[in-house]
C-alpha cells in the first residue's frame, strides 16, 4: 500500500482488480478546499488511458512489478524475442505489449521488461536513443537557419521529422516518448 503522495511515473496500481500504470501525475493544492492528485493512468492490458483524480493522501494499492534488463534479439513475425542478460532465458513478447517501443528497437539493444506474476506488462526504453537515418531527401547548404522539417526514415523503419540540414547516413538522437528529433549525434 502507498498513498497518492508517493505516486511516480511508471508505478503500477491495482485499482478494482485491474493494473494501471501511472503515465502522468500532478499534485494540486487549490486556494480553497483540500489538495488532490490529478493522474493519467494507462490500463496495462487494454492500453486505454483515463484521467483519475484522488484526494491527497488517499491509500492506493500498488502492484508488485519486477523490472529486468533484457536484450532485444529479433522479431520472428509473431512476437518479439528478448533475452534476460543475467540468466540468458529467452522471452517471447506479443507485439501489442511491445507497442510503440518497436519503433526504436534494434537487435542487441537493452530495454527494461516489467512483469507482474510472470506476465509481461510493458517495455521501458531509455528516454532517448541514437539511430541512423536510412532515407531522407538531401539537404541543401544554408538550410540550418529556418525551423522547417522534412520526413526521415530511421534504421528501424520508423519515420520522424528532422531539420532540413540532416542527411541520409547521419545518426540522430530521438525521444522515445514522442518520436521527436533531439539532435545530431557527433562523431
Curated annotation (Swiss-Prot):
SUPFAM superfamilies: Nucleic acid-binding proteins, Translation proteins SH3-like domain. One of its GO terms (cellular component) is cytoplasm. CDD domains: S1_EF-P_repeat_1, S1_EF-P_repeat_2. Its main location: cytoplasm. Disulfide bonds: none annotated. Pfam families: EFP (PF01132), EFP_N (PF08207), Elong-fact-P_C (PF09285). GO terms for molecular function: translation elongation factor activity. It comes from the Bacteria. The keyword Protein biosynthesis applies. One of its GO terms (biological process) is peptide biosynthetic process. Pathway: Protein biosynthesis; polypeptide chain elongation. Keywords: Cytoplasm, Elongation factor, Protein biosynthesis. It is found in: Cytoplasm. Involved in peptide bond synthesis. Stimulates efficient translation and peptide-bond synthesis on native or reconstituted 70S ribosomes in vitro. Probably functions indirectly by altering the affinity of the ribosome for aminoacyl-tRNA, thus increasing their reactivity as acceptors for peptidyl transferase. Belongs to the elongation factor P family. HAMAP family: EF_P (MF_00141). This is Elongation factor P.
